[in-house]
Amino acid sequence: MILLNQRYYAMYEHHPSFELPENSEEKMIWRYMDLPKFISLIDKKSLFFTKASKFPDPYEGTIPKHNEVVRRTIYEQVKPEFESDEQFDSFIRSVPKIFGSILKQYRELMLINSWHFNDYESAALWELYGKETAIAIQSSINELKDSFTKTTDTIWIGKVNYIDFNHEWMDEWNIHEAFVIKRPSFFYESEIRAITCLPDDHIDKNISCKFDVEREKKPISPQHSVDPTELTTHGKYVKVDLNKLINKVYLSPAAPSYFKQVLESIISKYELNKEIIKSDLYTLK
């Protein structure tokens, strides 16, 4: 926590469930967006964190199918703690329902802001955002961490691991892991996630971000009450220091010649002095 204007603010906090690539603090990260989202960012001075339940991937925040296949084998080591085989069998049968219920609630609580981890621009992501007015913010993991100085939210940052849901096990006792795994089809995203959590009063009182039965893992604490002006049905806005967050602003390689001047005019109105570079990804040198 830091003290700012006589008020305590939360900021980036390490959490063992959310790991970063080794020696990655100075590595570049990118956030691709269209022009309206960029204007929203600089106007609100906030990053938008989306509820996990609102992501288009239906596997977001779920347990891999392979867990069902190997669950009994994995839990055999704790079988002696049960009074009978019947009790153990009952436990195994109950696990999918228990975790299914918890994850359903977590998908509403966990809020995610996605970044691309790469030393270079991504041709795939330029194509995905495709329009001539697409924009990419260049930052670094350290700059992202340092930008969360104007919020009461605690922010965690971690890399996404790409696993085969049909053949790989996820530690289901660490529920948080479900929000940093994706299928290999998304590997091109090379995703880094900033993550925060809604307070308990936005969901079932029996489930909150405090839940974590794996003792050696640090629980996620519930957050402060949310300013209703920051909250939407899809997530919430989190205040950031734009001067710390943004290193450079890149324009789409397909951007028309006048677009750089338009963007310079826009950011000057917000007193944001950042270099604007048109991508030369498709320029023969």
Describe the role of every protein-language-model region.
Residues 1-285:
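Partner-binding and oligomerization surfaces adjacent to conserved cores of proteins
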